[in-house]
């Protein structure tokens, strides 16, 4: 009877070992550098769609950009003259791994230190300019960063120039200990001398501006601008919540929150910063 008929066995096929891995070689790979994930809206974005300003087309999030990219966006073409290149970072505490970390940062960013300093023209207005780069050890402020910015203010006093600084930092550089913390007072003293000379100082807070930089020259500008949604603060959110034992607002330490509470004069879109800088410099006496 069919009910008790023995079922036929399946045919067994032995895989050919020579074919193993051949399929994977034929699958096209998508290069990692083609796309970027927006930290805000989580969308995957074709990098060319970000444009030169690197702004998310979906939610307008401002990606972090390098000092060189910001220079291209801000100053007149061919006008930038870099200064204080020869100042070298030392290792006063002989901190383990510090020299290796510095070398890697130099190779990755193409910078000598976490800040780019020099003179430039912005729509015909000459300025003394500093741009901090968070890709270089999170733009932490060590002795060289402090020295370069101090010298920039001293040069600006001698040449009667306004100073414009794009800030970005994770704070003082722990590998240099108290020498790093001293830069806060040193740069602030230079800012004061520049102010006493009747010269204009403009700061633009970018993401992130925290720690000792926030507690010193970042918040000492005659006018303080900020890019949208930039993180700006001193201590970290969790540290503050633990200390005060309260839950902080969701937008706490965002540029918009600081503007609402009088710490920032205006939030300016990245694509509009060049025009805004030129206007403010011209309005406050210019840098001809």
Swiss-Prot record:
Keywords: ATP-binding, Cytoplasm, Fatty acid biosynthesis, Fatty acid metabolism, Lipid biosynthesis, Lipid metabolism, Metal-binding, Nucleotide-binding, Transferase, Zinc, Zinc-finger. It catalyses: N(6)-carboxybiotinyl-L-lysyl-[protein] + acetyl-CoA = N(6)-biotinyl-L-lysyl-[protein] + malonyl-CoA. It is found in: Cytoplasm. It comes from the Bacteria. Pfam families: Carboxyl_trans (PF01039). Zn(2+) binds at residues 38, 41, 56, 59. GO terms for molecular function: acetyl-CoA carboxylase activity; ATP binding; carboxyl- or carbamoyltransferase activity; zinc ion binding. The keyword Membrane does not apply. Residues 34-288 form the CoA carboxyltransferase N-terminal domain. This is Acetyl-coenzyme A carboxylase carboxyl transferase subunit beta. It comes from Streptococcus pyogenes serotype M3 (strain ATCC BAA-595 / MGAS315). The lineage of its organism: Bacteria, Bacillati, Bacillota, Bacilli, Lactobacillales. The gene is accD.
